[in-house]
């Protein structure tokens, strides 16, 4: 961004996150109907569906924001970067906590699906198009369907560097 005004006017990922933060505040205050209304409008306007009950940290970056789904019991840590078409969804197998817990500094590639009550460790990378169904250790890179560990994260903070290159041994 060249100015502080650009994200406010032009970046729908930023705009959707701000709408989510208002909806989440309403959700915590017991104003669930208003929170759902904001969620619905955000989904219609931006193509991003973030449940107001989800917990999202600070410093989140949604790049090329479209087709993002974040479920009710999902937890997203600080400084996470996600590209378009990311889903943090449930599998239908769990009753209480149905959605994933994403650690700090994680990079979620385009089209990544992280499903169920699992954790993605801090400073990890999920490759584009991967389907993650099991816990991901810290500072690792996972790829594939279903996702498997393919190496180290490659840097100390993949969400900031946006390094998506997987180095094969």
Tell where the protein language model's regions lie, with residue ranges.
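Terminal amphipathic alpha-helical/low-complexity segments used for targeting or macromolecular assembly
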Residues: 1-43, 156-169
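Structural signal for interior beta-strand "rungs" in well-ordered beta-sheet cores
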Residues: 43-150
């Amino acid at each position: 961004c060249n100015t502080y005004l650009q994200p406010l006017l032009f970046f729908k990922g930023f705009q959707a996150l701000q709408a989510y933060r208002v909806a989440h505040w309403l959700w915590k205050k017991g104003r669930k109907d208003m929170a759902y209304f904001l969620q619905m409008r955000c989904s219609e306007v931006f193509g991003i569906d973030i449940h107001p009950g989800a917990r999202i940290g600070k410093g989140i970056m949604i790049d090329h924001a479209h087709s993002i789904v974040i479920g009710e019991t999902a937890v997203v840590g600080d400084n996470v970067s996600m590209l378009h078409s990311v889903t943090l969804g449930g599998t239908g197998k769990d009753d209480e906590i149905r959605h994933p817990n994403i650690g700090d500094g994680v990079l979620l590639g385009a089209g990544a699906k992280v499903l169920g009550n699992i954790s993605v460790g801090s400073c990890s990378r999920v490759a584009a198009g991967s389907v993650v169904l099991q816990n991901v250790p810290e500072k690792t890179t996972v790829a594939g369907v279903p996702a498997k560990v393919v190496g180290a994260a490659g840097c100390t903070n993949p969400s900031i560097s946006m390094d998506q290159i997987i180095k094969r041994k």
